[in-house]
Amino acid sequence: MPAPKPPAFETLSLHAGQHPDPVTRSRAVPIYQTTSYLFDDADHAAGLFNLERAGHIYTRISNPTTAVLEERLAALEDGVGAVCTASGMAAMHLAIATLLSAGDHIVASASLYGGTINLLTHTLPRFGITTTFVKPRDLDGFRAAIGPKTRLVVGETLGNPGLEVLDIPRVAEIAHAAAVPLLVDNTFATPYLSRPLTLGADIVMHSITKWIGGHGIAIGGALIDGGRFDWRASGKFPTLSEPYAGYHGIVFAEEFGPASFIMRARAEGLRDFGACLSPTNAFHLLQGVETLALRMERHMHNTKAVLDFLRKNAAVDWVLHPSLETHPDHERAKSLLPNGAGAIVSFGVKGGRAAGRKFIEAVRLSSHLANVGDAKTLVIHPASTTHQQMDAAALAAAGVGEELIRVSVGLEAAGDIIDDLAQALRASQKA
C-alpha cells in the first residue's frame, strides 16, 4: 500500500500540531492561560525536570497553546522543532546565546533588520561576541570573513532595505565547508514564499509579528531547527556536544540528536532568559497562521498591481522589488522565490526629502507607521522619521535615500491602495 501523501501547505497551516482537547472536544485551539501544571507524583515531576519525559512544568518554558504554534511553524518550515519567543529580536538573541560564547565570532549579511544590526554591532561585543558584516551578494566576502572563531553565519531571505535575495544554497555551502551553521531570518518571505531549511539553511528565525501573524495585534518570534547540522562532528559547539551542568551533565547532542539545538534553546534559553511568548499572543498568532497562504496570495497580487502603477507614475524616480527585471537579483528571485518576492516595495519620489514628507502626510488609506507585514497597507518615509537625524550623505551611506518611500502592501482592494498612493504622489509634487 503506498504511503499517504503529505498534507499540503494550506492544510498544515490549519491542522499541524493540534490534537483536539479530549475532554472539552474544542475544535479551536484553546488558550491555556496558566502559569504552571500539576504533577502526577514525585517521579513524574522528576522526569520532567530531568528532561526524561515530555510535558509542561511552567509556561516560561512551554505551554500547550504555544506548543501548537511551535509545531505548526516547524511543519511549515520543514523543521524538526521550534521555540516561540516574546519577539523576533528575542528569537535572534536566543539562537546566538544557545550556540556562542565570549570570544566567538559571527559573519553576517550587511543587509539585516536594524534591530539585528544593533544587536550584533553594539550589544553583543559587550559580551565578547564580534561580527563581520559582508554585502549579501559577495559570496567570496562570506568565505573570506569566516575565521577559526566563527560559529554562525546570518542572513535574511530578503534583505533590508535593499530587498537583496540571499543565495541561500551557496551561502550554506560556504558555511558548511567551515563546519558552521547558517541562520536565515525568513520574516519578509514567510514559509509560503521560501523555506530556507530546504535550501540548505540550518536554523530559521521569524518575527511572527509580521506576515505570519499578519494583523498587527500581537508581537512574537520563533526559531525553527532544521535538524540537519551535525553539532558533534563540527567540534565547535560545546553547548551541544559536551555535558551541561545546568541539567545534571546532559549532553544535548546525545540525548536529542537532530533536535539538540532547539531543545537547548528551550531548556536553557527560555528558562534562564525568560523571553517567552504569552499563550494569549500565541493564540492570536495562530489565527494568522491559519490564513497565511490565502493572505500571501493576496499580498502578492496587490504588490504586482502597486508595482505596475508606480513604474508608470511621473512622480516616481525609481522602484525597487526583486520581481522587477531591473532588480539585480531578479533571476535569483525567480528561482528561489517562485511564489512571489514579498510585499515590501521601495520607491523614490521626485523632489527628495521635502517631497517624501509631503507624500507621507497626504496618505489617507495607508497607515503611516514603522511596522511591516500588516493586513493594512503601511507606509513610511525614513528620511523624515526613523532616520531624520541624518543628513543626505549619512543617509546615502546607510542605503536610505532622502527620496525613499517604503510600502508594506496590504490586503485592501488593489484599486483603493493605488488611488491613495496616486493622490499622495500628486500632493508630493505641489509647491
For each predicted feature, which ranges?
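Conserved small-domain helix->loop->beta segment predominantly found in fold-type I
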Residues: F273-C276, N281-A282, Q287, T291, ...
